[in-house]
């Protein structure tokens, strides 16, 4: 949705709850993304989530978009299939939201909005020719288009599931695991 979040969000929430045959009294928690993302969109979502949480005395948990996407990669994959995980999210601008984690899920380059060329300068300081890099997130293709030739062989093939954008299921799984 490009515009109109403020007027659309509560009716969308009410419709989803109604269609699920649940009521807010059935909820044990509410999860909301805390960014990165559009400042206005984040404020609207956080205000709606906080309003529902306070009104219905339900715990509220904030989830980073990077954390929500990263949780798709299971523990076995982390331990065996790559050295670094790049989470690249579409910012709907020229830059991307990018974060880099190691195979233990520890942040090695903190996330934020960054030009991919600037990011690759930082990344090159962390890798050698044997470092394997997995890319996930809906900005992965854009990131790889700008990858320097001298490190391109470090990147693992991207599967289709890894290209999917963040969705509510990712946020819910992450919140459930953190609760």
Across the structure, where does each feature detected by a protein language model lie?
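Active-site catalytic microenvironments for nucleophilic, acid-base chemistry
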Residues: 15, 55, 72-76, 103, ...
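Residues at secondary-structure transition points
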Residues: 3-8, 39-43, 47, 64, ...
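N-terminal beta-alpha supersecondary unit
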Residues: 1-34
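Phosphate-handling active-site elements
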Residues: 19-25, 54-63, 80
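Surface "functional belts" at beta-alpha junctions
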Residues: 59-165
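Glycine-rich phosphate-binding/hydrolytic loop that grips phosphoryl groups
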Residues: 160-179
């Amino acid at each position: 949705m490009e515009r109109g979040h403020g007027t659309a969000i509560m009716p969308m929430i009410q419709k989803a709850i109604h269609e699920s045959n649940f009521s807010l009294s059935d909820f044990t928690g509410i999860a909301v993304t805390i960014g990165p993302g559009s400042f206005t969109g984040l404020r609207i979502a956080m205000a709606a989530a906080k309003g529902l949480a306070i009104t219905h005395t339900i715990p509220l948990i904030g989830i980073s978009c990077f954390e929500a996407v990263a949780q798709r990669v299971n523990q076995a994959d982390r331990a065996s299939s790559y050295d670094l995980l790049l989470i690249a999210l579409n910012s709907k601008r020229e830059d991307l939201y990018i974060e880099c984690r190691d195979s233990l899920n520890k942040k090695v380059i903190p996330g934020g909005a960054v030009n991919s060329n600037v990011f690759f300068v930082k990344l090159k300081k962390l890798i050698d020719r044997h470092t394997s890099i997995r890319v996930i997130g809906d900005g992965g293709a854009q990131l790889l288009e700008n990858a320097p030739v001298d490190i391109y062989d470090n990147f693992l093939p991207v599967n289709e599931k890894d290209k999917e954008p963040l969705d509510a299921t990712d946020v819910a799984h992450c919140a459930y695991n953190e609760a």
